[in-house]
Amino acid sequence: MGSTGTAVARLAFMTELLRPLRGIVGPPVPIVPFHNWDYYYITQNLTWDPDTADKENYESVTAPRYFVTDLASIPEPFWSALPPTGPYSYPAIIHDWMYWTQPHARSGDDDRAYADGVLKLAMAELKVPALKAVAIYEAVRAFGAGAWAGNADARGGGEKRVLKRVPTDARTTWAEWKQNLDNFA
């Protein structure tokens, strides 16, 4: 393939990767940002139910109202292609809840693989473009162990992620809010 053909192929790949999703199916993602826009809380329960074909291997997952999430934990250098918010936000919130609570804690990496599998299925069910879904899934499989362990350590150290009350001042940061344990359920 000549240089023109290579350029056209790259352009087609990038066009597909960056194509906005239209016609997303499912509930809206009800989120409110903290001041720095690095953490958010959801304003109602969010539930993922596996499709019929997946019910044998996966259970429904519900992230509760006022759960605090960072949405998709995508490093800043990749934001032009995969911003932290996108059609994958709903699956990312469910995934964050599972990484926080680690509800299927059975034996090491299998637990994380289960949560990552839920993310993959939820993105497919919400018709996240395939290239974006694959990039996100492969990244969490390759690099998610640190977040999994960090969440277990934070929970063990007393950190909470479900709010009892929400900030009333738009200048409130997550770093400030999480210092007061009275803010949590």
Which residue ranges define each predicted feature?
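Extended terminal accessory/targeting regions
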Residues: G2-A185
